Design a protein with these regions (language model features):
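Short aromatic-enriched loop/helix-cap "lid" or pocket-rim segments at secondary-structure transitions
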Residues: 110-112, 180-184
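Catalytic-core regions of glycoside hydrolase
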Residues: 30-52, 56-61, 91-95, 168-175, ...
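An active-site-proximal structural segment forming one wall of the substrate-binding cleft
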Residues: 86-91, 127-129, 134-170, 196-203
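Bacterial N-terminal signal peptides that target proteins for export
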Residues: 1-11
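Short, flexible loop/turn elements at secondary-structure junctions
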Residues: 64-68, 73, 101-105, 164, ...
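N-terminal substrate-binding region of glycoside hydrolase catalytic domains
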Residues: 28-144, 233
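Bacterial Sec-dependent signal peptides at the C-terminal "C-region" and cleavage site
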Residues: 15-30
Length: 233
């Protein structure tokens, strides 16, 4: 038998051995039909922290007002927030957060969602009582508010962005519920122009490096920075 023939026979033998090994490794499994929902980790609907709905959800929504985050200028109430929302327990359970920071949440009574100290330094927004509810809408073009926002978002990132506990950060801050719209037709100070809005968004872009950033609407800065979009939680 010449060398070429011997080589061909050897190759055929090796292929045969290989096929035999693969055949011995094949494992067949039969799955039972299951119509129930199953966990889709960190994707989909996120009930609010503290809600009893969907107790097995591994993603929870946490909304923080500026007033509760920074009650005194430059001092952040992390211990109070951790205790109020039971964040240590959520971490132990492997639950992750969707975080939104807000300045104006319409409610049933007149109230402030920014800190008293910040209101005292600005006070150029609009108190309102509309079909949305009651509250105070800041003038987001105010330079003092802008500078303070840069600092508080940096503090939020320093506290929440290091350990992966917060998976998503919704770019709130502006407008009612942090949704980037204001009922200005009722006489409220309107939303700032795109240049100023982009400055607020840039605060988040510069501060957070681990959490995925989301916007309520596909503004130009969201497109150019490949941000995700979210619907209300």
């Amino acid at each position: 038998m010449d060398k070429l023939s011997k080589g061909f026979v050897s190759a055929v033998c090796l292929l045969g051995v290989g096929f035999g090994m693969v055949r011995n490794m094949i494992c067949t499994r039969t799955y039972q039909e299951d119509p129930s929902a199953f966990a889709n980790a960190q994707i989909g609907y996120a009930p609010m922290v503290g809600s009893t709905d969907h107790p097995n959800a591994t993603l929870r929504y946490l909304e923080l007002t500026w007033r509760e985050v920074e009650p005194t200028e430059g001092q952040y109430a992390w211990d109070a927030i951790e205790q109020r929302y039971g964040l240590a327990g959520l971490r132990e359970q492997g639950i992750h957060l969707v975080l939104r920071f807000v300045c104006d949440v319409p409610g049933q009574k007149k109230h402030l969602d920014i800190p008293e100290w910040l209101y005292a330094q600005t006070a150029d927004g609009s108190w309102y009582s509309t079909s949305y509810g009651k509250g105070y809408s800041p003038d987001y073009a105010n330079d003092i508010l802008r500078a303070a926002h840069h600092k508080v978002v940096s503090a939020l990132a320093e506290h929440f962005d290091a350990d992966g506990f917060v998976t998503y950060v919704e770019l709130g801050s502006l407008g009612h519920w942090g949704e980037w719209h204001i009922k200005s037709s009722d006489g409220l100070v309107p939303m700032p122009d795109e240049t100023i809005r982009d400055q607020y968004a840039t605060d988040y872009l510069n501060a957070f490096s681990n959490a995925k950033l989301l916007m309520r609407r596909p503004f130009n800065i969201a497109v150019s920075n490949r941000l995700g979009l979210y619907n209300d939680m």
